[in-house]
């Protein structure tokens, strides 16, 4: 069974990846960002999965090559954090092809509703056990 090392993972990442893995791969999670110093944690893994803030430069690519990693998977659409020219011929890099074209508009609408319905004020008040609706309505 192939092993994938996930860097810069949070508990919600683990839950999501474990739920969708269905036992196809062995998954190893690290809270550390992928750097030259932490690349060795992926020893024995076929692939590493990095996040948007991981800097995959020459040093990281060389370190991953030395331990036999063949594939870098990005959990983001952008790839400006990867030295693609240096990676060419050394290691394969795959990324999320695109996000939903509606994602930004949907998020903007959610924020507008948050302001319009005074949701944050309501949240703060209920957190303090103040359930009156005098200011909110």
Regions picked out by a protein language model, each given a short descriptive name:
Residues 2-93:
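An N-terminal-biased, well-structured beta-alpha scaffold segment characteristic
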């Amino acid at each position: 069974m192939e092993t994938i090392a996930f860097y810069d993972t949070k508990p919600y990442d683990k839950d999501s990846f474990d739920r969708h893995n269905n036992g196809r791969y062995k998954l190893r999670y690290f809270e550390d960002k992928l750097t030259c110093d932490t690349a060795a944690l992926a020893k024995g893994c076929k692939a590493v999965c990095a996040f948007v803030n991981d800097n995959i430069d020459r040093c990281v690519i060389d370190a991953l090559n030395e331990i036999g990693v063949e594939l870098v998977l990005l959990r983001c659409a952008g790839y400006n954090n990867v030295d693609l020219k240096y990676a060419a011929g050394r290691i394969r890099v795959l990324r999320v092809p695109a996000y939903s074209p509606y994602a930004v508009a949907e998020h903007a609408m959610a924020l507008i509703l948050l302001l319009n319905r005074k949701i944050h004020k309501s949240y703060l008040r209920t957190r303090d056990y103040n359930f009156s609706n005098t200011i909110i309505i």
